[in-house]
């Protein structure tokens, strides 16, 4: 058996024996793979995932998928939070109480708890293109229906239904994980999700601007806010059509076509679900994301009204300040992903985990300070720092998610995303729905919960890479970790081939420092003397 064969003696030492470049093994292609790789505009690895990202390119399939993914997610964020900057007008029109506004905020993020769970399964079984396109277009009628409501119950119900569209986050992250190499996945996931989340800030600017334009055309305030909803509704329709016609599930084609050709195996949903829910790391990341992305969604719902009421600001000024919270995503979330990738390059997976803890704990501290701030400048500074750290933590979390499981990636992404929405709904219900707490006090308590709920990250341990405080298990290898998700019968049929390829490409998570140390240890001769000396 040749030592280059996966599973052969010495195969786990590739990159540390001195015979192979330590970081080349995960991305080199040759022979038939090299011929197949030549059809792509970007350099690719053995799975045909892009090894670089070129933001100004629309090359098919990698960069076209990237842009379709983040723009579709962006449009869903715009529509879901379009009501937030217009609440002072809507509440007067519909006679909404504080409880009604709080319940609507909970509803807007609760709907996607279910849709994100479903989207994870859809991505695994049908592919992200169908999931993304159909959800966006199915949500479009509910966005248009916002212009027809005339009661608090209708307002809450429609915001609940629009919130289902936030499940495009799952298809976005899944899509990026199938298109880009593991060495840059933190940055790519951060860019796609961060630019999509930016819609929560952009809508704070877009909707008041559209409202003002319609008002200047002669419409009454109570008519203008309704007509403004035609902008996000139209955006849904356009993006749904573009994703369906221009998108592609995998680097080599669409999932259904590849399955018919026999290039991709059809998986069992029950087994995919089983390996997702029985992996304890999944549940820790559900909690972590609940108090990173979750608090971001909660803040999107309350921040404009908070500044409007507490500091007696003009609606437009409050909207601009609130917009800066969501707009920070353009740099914050990608920065979190980039820090995750850079740390992993030298220290491996352990650096990714430390990155999550540092960023999310800092975000909780700044959230607490935001609630205690008594002046406008101090509040704005604390809000910006809280925003940056919380959103960077989101990027850092999805720098790790692709490594939790290869087989159940879609469902784990969906569960983690749903955790974000569950955390948002729970936090809004606890601190921002009743009159028991002021919004400032609610922000203080939310900051404390963020810091407390970040602590379980210390329990995340990968046998082959270790955890925050513990080294990797002796003899643990990537092939065994990802291969353990397949039964011996499935392995005999070769169904685990994609997992083995991913395992090979994920060896970079050992970190350059660990690889150097392993190579040094392998090169050191035994420190003993012959018995006859």
Swiss-Prot record:
Induction pattern: Circadian-regulation with a peak in the middle of the morning. Induced by nitrate and sucrose in roots. Down-regulated by ammonium, glutamine, asparagine and aspartate in roots.
GO biological process, one term: nitrate assimilation
Gene giving rise to this polypeptide: NRT2.1
Superkingdom of this protein's organism: Eukaryota
Main location: membrane
Matches recorded under InterPro entries: MFS (IPR011701), MFS_trans_sf (IPR036259), NO3_transporter (IPR044772)
Other remarks in the entry: Plants over-expressing NRT2.1 have accelerated growth under low nitrate conditions.
Family: Belongs to the major facilitator superfamily. Nitrate/nitrite porter (TC 2.A.1.8) family.
Protein name: High-affinity nitrate transporter 2.1
Gene Ontology MF terms: nitrate transmembrane transporter activity
Pfam families cross-referenced by the UniProt entry: MFS_1 (PF07690)
Keyword Glycoprotein: no
Lipid bilayer topology: Multi-pass membrane protein
UniProt keyword terms in alphabetical order: Cell membrane, Membrane, Nitrate assimilation, Transmembrane, Transmembrane helix
Residue spans crossing the bilayer: 70-90, 101-122, 133-153, 160-180, 190-210, 227-247, 283-303, 319-339, 351-371, 384-404, 411-431, 442-462
GO cellular component terms, semicolon-separated: plasma membrane
Function of the protein: Involved in nitrate transport, but does not seem to be able to mediate transport by its own. Acts as a dual component transporter with NAR2.1. Imports nitrate with high affinity when expressed with NAR2.1 in a heterologous system (Xenopus oocytes).
SUPFAM superfamilies, A to Z: MFS general substrate transporter (SSF103473)
Subcellular location, record wording: Cell membrane
Expression tissues: Expressed in primary and lateral roots, root-shoot junction zone, vascular tissues of adventitious root primordia, leaves and at the base of the embryo in germinating seeds.
Quaternary structure annotation from Swiss-Prot or TrEMBL: Heterotetramer composed of two NRT2.1 and two NAR2.1. Interacts with NAR2.1.
């Amino acid at each position: 058996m040749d030592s280059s064969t996966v599973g052969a003696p010495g195969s786990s030492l590739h990159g540390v024996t001195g015979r192979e470049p330590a970081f080349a093994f995960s991305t080199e292609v040759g022979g038939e793979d090299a011929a197949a790789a030549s059809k792509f505009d970007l350099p690719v690895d053995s799975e045909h995932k892009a090894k670089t990202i070129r933001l100004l390119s629309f090359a098919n399939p990698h960069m076209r998928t990237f842009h379709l993914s983040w723009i579709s997610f962006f449009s869903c964020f715009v529509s879901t939070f379009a009501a937030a900057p217009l609440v002072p007008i809507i509440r007067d029109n519909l006679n909404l109480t504080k409880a009604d506004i709080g319940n609507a905020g909970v509803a807007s993020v609760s709907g996607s708890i279910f849709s994100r769970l479903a989207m994870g399964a859809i991505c695994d079984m049908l592919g992200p293109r169908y999931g993304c396109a159909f959800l966006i277009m199915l949500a479009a009628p509910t966005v248009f229906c916002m212009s027809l409501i005339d009661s608090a119950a209708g307002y809450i119900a429609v915001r609940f239904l629009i919130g289902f569209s936030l499940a495009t986050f799952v298809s976005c992250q899944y899509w990026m994980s199938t298109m880009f190499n593991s060495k840059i996945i933190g940055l790519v996931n951060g860019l796609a999700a961060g630019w999509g989340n930016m819609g929560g800030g952009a809508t704070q600017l877009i909707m008041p601007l559209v409202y003002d334009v319609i008002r200047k055309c002669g419409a009454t305030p109570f008519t203008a806010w309704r007509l403004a909803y035609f902008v996000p509704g139209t955006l849904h329709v356009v993006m749904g059509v573009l994703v369906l016609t221009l998108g592609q599930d995998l680097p080599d084609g669409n999932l259904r076509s590849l399955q018919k050709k026999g290039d991709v195996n059809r998986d069992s949903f029950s087994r995919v679900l089983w390996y997702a829910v029985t992996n304890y790391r999944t549940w820790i990341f559900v909690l972590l994301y609940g108090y990173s992305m979750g608090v971001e969604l909660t803040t999107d719902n309350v921040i404009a009204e908070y500044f409007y009421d507490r500091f007696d600001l003009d609606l437009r000024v409050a909207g601009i300040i609130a917009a800066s919270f969501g707009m920070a995503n353009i740099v914050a979330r990608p920065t979190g992903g980039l820090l995750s990738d850079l740390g992993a390059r030298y220290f491996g997976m352990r650096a990714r985990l430390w990155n999550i803890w540092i960023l999310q704990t800092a975000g909780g501290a700044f959230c607490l300070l935001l609630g205690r701030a008594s002046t406008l400048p101090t509040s704005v500074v604390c809000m910006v720092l809280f925003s940056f750290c919380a959103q960077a933590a989101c990027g850092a979390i999805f720098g790790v998610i692709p490594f939790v499981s290869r087989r159940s990636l879609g469902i784990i992404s969906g569960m983690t995303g749903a955790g974000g929405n569950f955390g948002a709904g729970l936090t809004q219900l606890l601190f921002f729905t009743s009159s028991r707490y002021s919004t400032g006090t609610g922000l203080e308590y939310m900051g404390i919960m963020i810091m407390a709920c970040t602590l379980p990250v210390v329990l995340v341990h990968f046998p082959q890479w270790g955890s925050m405080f513990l080294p990797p298990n002796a003899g643990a290898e990537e092939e065994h970790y990802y291969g353990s998700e397949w039964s011996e019968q499935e392995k005999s049929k070769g169904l685990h081939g994609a997992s083995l390829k991913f395992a090979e490409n994920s060896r970079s998570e050992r970190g350059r420092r660990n690889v150097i140390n392993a190579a040094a240890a392998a090169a050191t001769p035994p420190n003993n003397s012959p018995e006859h000396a």
